[in-house]
Each structure stands twice: as C-alpha cells, then as structure tokens.
C-alpha cells in the first residue's frame, strides 16, 4: 500500500562519480557515514545529541512518541543544501526521516532512531508575499501561527490550520481542514506551486500546468512521500477580520443530546447555508475532568458576525454556554491565544484515530456512546489522561469548494456528502500506557463498525489522512484509479521506492 504519511526511505547506493565523499571513516553505519559527511560539509547546520539544536529538533513534537534520537539532525535553509544531503543519503544508503512542524503523533512519521538521519525543515522559515499579494511563499519550517502573524494588518489570510501550533507541510499534503474550507476547500486546493527535492537530488517546482503537474496533483492530498518540500506558494484570501472562539456548554445529559443534534443539523444545513461558518465540536473526559464529560465547540465566521443564523443551534437558548470566547478578532490574535494551553501539554504523548460516517443521527449517537462507554473500561488505570471525541460535520459545500481549482487524489464527490469525520484522541503521560490506549482505540473502532453494520448504517470508505492512526487503511478510501496514479507518480520520481 502507498505509505503516504511517512518519508523514511532507504535510498540505495549509486555511482560515486556524482559526488566526492572524502575521508569518511570506514566501519561506520550508513547513518554515521552520512552524518560525518554532512558535518564536514555543513558544520553549522548538522548537529549531534550533545548540541542544543539537535535537542530542539528531536524533542519539539506534538507527541513524545516522536522523540527517537536520530544519528544526527541536518537542518538546511536552502533547497540546494537539502539536495546535497539527499545525494549523500543515497550514496551511503542511509535511512532518513523528514520533519515539518512535528504535529503528526505517529512516532516514526516525523523522526527516526539512531539508524538514520533526521532532515529538519526548521531552517525553511521564509515568508514572502508576491508583488501583487495574490500568493504567499511559505517555508515548511513555519507553523500556522507564524503565517498568520506575518499576514497581520495585510487584510489577507491563507486557507491554513485552525490552530497556530500546527505545522505546515504534513497538514497541506494530507489535504488540510481549515476554518475557511467551506468557502475555499481543502488547504491543498489552494496551492499555487510547490518546490522540493526529489529522490535524484534535483530541485523542482511543480505547478498545475508545468512539466511537474503530476507531482503537483499528488501533493494535493496524497501525502508527503513524493518530494522533500522546501516551499509552498499559497493563494491568499481576503480576511481582515474573523469571528472565532471556543464555547463550553457543560456536562448535562440535555447538553449532550442538543450538542449531538447541533452537529447533525450543521452537517445537513449549516455548512450549506453559510459558507463562512465552521464548527469544530469536541467532547472530553478524563482525569482532568472531575465533573464528567464536557461538551464544547470551536465556532468560526469569516467576517464580523457573532449572530449568524447558521450558528444559532450553538448558542442560547438552544445550547447555553458556561463560558464563551466567540468574538471578532484576527487570525493573528486567535492563533496566539491558545499557545499557553498547548505549552502546558507539550512533551506528553498523544494518539489520533479517525472514523467516518455519513451524516446520520443514529451513527453519531452510536459513536459518541461507544467512545465514552469504553473510556473507563480501558483507560481507568492511567494516572493521567484526556480522551476527546471531535465529530467534524463536513457538508457537500466543502467537497464542492475543493474542486473549484482542479482535482485532488481524494476526489470526494459532493453528492456523496454530507459526512461526519470523527477524530478520536487520547492524551497521556507515559510510554507504558501505550498498550491501554491502543486497545481502547481498537475496541472503539471494532465496536462502532459492528454496531453500525447491525443497524444497516453504511460508512464512507474515506478516512482523513491527517487524523489517521498508524495502520489505518487511509488509501483504501481514495479512488482505486487515483491510488494507481499516485503509485506511478511516486515510482517516476523515486524509482527505488
């Protein structure tokens, strides 16, 4: 199966004539030889375990499961330097991993152990508007908070992440759900060009209509296994002011039922009636929630309006708030507002798992009840944990907007919608709890599928790549012809994969 979310490839050796690899120690592992070569060639951007830059790149992840201690870290700031590293990796036959913002919680999706080299995007921090401000050049070493901060006072934004702490490259190449997606589609639908290094060590720029248009298409949701990206050029959108915030609704049974009803109705009608509106509901329980499961929603309106009719089910008197930050602001201010909260959980362990259903109230109830019934059965022995269910209502309009600027590997049919995509996440503290978390997520997945089948409720095959757990069959949900095309494209640009 097409790996999609991981770029940890072993590139076999080729003739040495293309490079001069002098005075590299004999008897070292392929990774150690590569590290020595990179250090001799680029001493300022090659680091080892006793250096602060290595420590940052090896530990600054969304989940501590990604701290794997590579042989060395190479952090270039230019595409040509990265190209030299790719050729060295190929010559020595060293495994490697590439990291962007470090948000994917699957450990080996963005790091590698001492058998390989970590290529860090942290040096690719360029942010530059085009002369007419129609596009923004974005280096993959940024986070979305950096992007929104750069665009402050320009009246522009990007179809990017909903939280400032999220990284850039994995988000985009997995599709990317944005606040703005109901108007403009996937984040990946708003790429103007992508520059990166392919397996041969060549630096290429892919656009919809140049010689690398197939690569451009693959990177619009096919994952990051096609090139090492050094820059995105993203189409800008007008967004001088937005209305956004998080509303908490409490823990009562009535709140739960109305919260579920609101999700279902927004999937059917809200996203269709208001293309400026987005709702990201979440329900959380765990050791930090002594009063029981707490129901919240992150609400968004593209403009200045706290009373959009499409969001009425998320406000009083239907759902009464216990706290509310929904207010007019900017994407810059919003992206900075939650940093302290995320700093408080930095260094913990996290797992995602994704499910999909059509917009069906019975399915929504089944998944909610199954998730929260199985939490105490599987997770009660954990000293600290937070289990969260995030059912995201995805309207037909989302799929329509994603097709405006051409196709993508997901190729979701608007007439197949609306969907609800469920991100299940567990935050926990120690590695030994991994087996309990894995058993919990697997049990929810299996029980939900069994109960839905018993009720005659069909599920879409599509699973959102960016919320998927390791081993989930993401690409089985892509059209078979598109998967074949993705494999052909990957073989074209990396024949040894």
Describe the residue ranges of each PLM region.
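Glycine-rich N-terminal segment of FAD-binding domains in flavoprotein oxidoreductases
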Residues: 51, 62-124, 138-140
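Signal-peptide-cleavage-adjacent N-terminal segments of secreted and extracellular proteins
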Residues: 19-87
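Activity-critical C-terminal alpha-helical subdomain
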Residues: 455-497
């Amino acid at each position: 199966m097409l790996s999609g979310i991981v770029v940890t490839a072993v590139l076999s050796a080729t003739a040495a004539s293309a490079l001069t690899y002098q005075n590299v120690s004999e008897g070292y592992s392929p990774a150690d030889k590569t590290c020595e070569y990179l250090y001799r060639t680029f001493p300022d951007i090659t680091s080892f375990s006793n250096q602060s830059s290595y420590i940052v790149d090896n530990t600054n992840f969304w989940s501590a499961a990604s701290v794997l201690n590579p042989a060395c870290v190479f952090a270039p700031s230019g595409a040509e330097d990265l190209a030299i590293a790719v050729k060295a990796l190929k010559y020595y036959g060293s495994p490697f991993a590439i990291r962007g913002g470090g948000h994917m919680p699957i450990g080996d999706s963005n790091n590698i152990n001492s058998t390989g080299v970590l290529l860090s995007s942290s040096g690719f921090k360029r942010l530059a508007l085009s002369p007419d401000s129609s596009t923004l050049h974005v280096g993959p070493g940024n986070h979305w908070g950096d992007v929104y901060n750069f665009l402050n006072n320009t009246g522009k934004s990007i179809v990017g992440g909903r939280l400032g702490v999220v990284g850039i490259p994995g988000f985009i190449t997995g599709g990317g759900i944005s606040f703005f997606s109901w108007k403009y589609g996937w984040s990946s639908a708003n790429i103007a060009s992508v520059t990166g290094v392919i397996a041969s060590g060549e630096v290429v720029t892919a656009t919809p209509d140049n010689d690398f248009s197939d690569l451009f298409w693959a990177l619009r949701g096919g994952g990051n296994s096609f090139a090492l990206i050094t820059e995105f050029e993203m189409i800008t959108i007008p967004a001088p002011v937005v209305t956004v915030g998080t509303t908490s609704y409490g823990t009562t049974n009535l709140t739960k039922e109305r919260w579920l009803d609101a999700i279902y109705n927004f999937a059917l009608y809200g996203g269709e009636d208001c293309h400026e509106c987005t709702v990201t509901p979440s329900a959380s329980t765990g050791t930090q929630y002594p009063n029981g499961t707490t129901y919240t929603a992150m609400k968004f309106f593209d403009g200045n309006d706290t009373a959009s009719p499409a969001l009425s089910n998320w406000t009083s008197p239907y759902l009464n708030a216990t706290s509310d930050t929904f207010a007019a602001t900017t994407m810059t201010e919003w992206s900075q507002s939650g940093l302290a909260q995320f700093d408080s959980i930095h260094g913990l362990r996290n797992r995602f798992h994704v499910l999909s259903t059509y917009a069906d109230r019975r399915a929504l109830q089944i998944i909610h009840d199954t998730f929260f019934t199985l939490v105490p059965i599987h997770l009660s022995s954990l000293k600290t944990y937070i289990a969260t269910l995030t059912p995201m209502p995805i309207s037909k309009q989302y799929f329509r907007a994603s097709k405006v600027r051409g196709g993508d590997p997901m190729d979701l049919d608007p007439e197949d919608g609306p969907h609800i995509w469920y991100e299940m996440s567990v935050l926990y503290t120690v590695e030994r709890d991994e087996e309990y978390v894995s058993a919990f997520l697997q049990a929810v997945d299996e029980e939900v599928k069994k109960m839905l089948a018993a009720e005659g409720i069909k599920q879409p095959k599509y699973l959102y790549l960016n919320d998927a757990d390791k081993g989930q069959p993401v690409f089985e949900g892509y059209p078979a012809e598109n998967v074949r095309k993705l494999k052909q494209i990957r073989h074209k640009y990396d024949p040894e994969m």
